[in-house]
Amino acid sequence: MQILLAALIAYLIGSVSFAVIVSAAMGLADPRSYGSKNPGATNVLRSGNKKAAILTLIGDAFKGWIAVWLARRYGLPDVAIAWVAIAVFIGHLYPVFFRFQGGKGVATAAGVLLAVHPVLGLATALTWLIIAFFFRYSSLAALVAAVFAPLFDVFLFGTNHNPIAWAVLAMSVLLVWRHRGNIAKLLAGEESRIGDKKKAAANGNAQDGGKA
């Protein structure tokens, strides 16, 4: 019962979509309506509003971190922490508060990994940053980081009696699956690079002919 309750709370935390909330608060269009239609920091960046993208990134990472941190704070066993990690991640992918239309989970997964162990989170985040810097593809960086995250975890903690390692692997598999459309675009040379503006995301209520 304790594990079920912890997982449910984690799922509800994960269901808070900061991309949608921040965009609405800052007078931007719903990120599910433009660009990749993904409610995540990279797509919010396509609105041209870097502040909104940064706030989205921080919020999505924080909810992953706080869910796992709370589980540890209250002394839950590793099995429960593993379920909490998966639940908060799934909450981001399929948020009950936003008609189950969620993001792809990169920032939330990063927050989870940082809470599991700072070295694990930083190593995975550094992998993302290196690939993103050289190739300018957020999706490619996410895919590479997803592949390396379970390897980093095994290297740091091994596999014996380590249910969290299975949670990390499950998140990586889900993250890759959520990027299946991006994989097709990467192979076809049609994937958008970081910073591309596919569509103006200013609120339609802007005055003077829609000037920003």
Swiss-Prot record:
Q: Which is a Gene Ontology cellular component entry for this protein?
A: plasma membrane
GO biological process terms held by the UniProt record: phospholipid biosynthetic process
List the residue ranges forming a coiled coil, or say none: none
Any Pfam family: G3P_acyltransf
Q: What is this protein called?
A: Glycerol-3-phosphate acyltransferase
Q: How does it sit in the membrane?
A: Multi-pass membrane protein
Question: What is the protein's known function?
Answer: Catalyzes the transfer of an acyl group from acyl-phosphate (acyl-PO(4)) to glycerol-3-phosphate (G3P) to form lysophosphatidic acid (LPA). This enzyme utilizes acyl-phosphate as fatty acyl donor, but not acyl-CoA or acyl-ACP.
The source's domain of life comes to Bacteria
What phylogenetic lineage does the species belong to? Bacteria, Pseudomonadati, Pseudomonadota, Betaproteobacteria, Burkholderiales
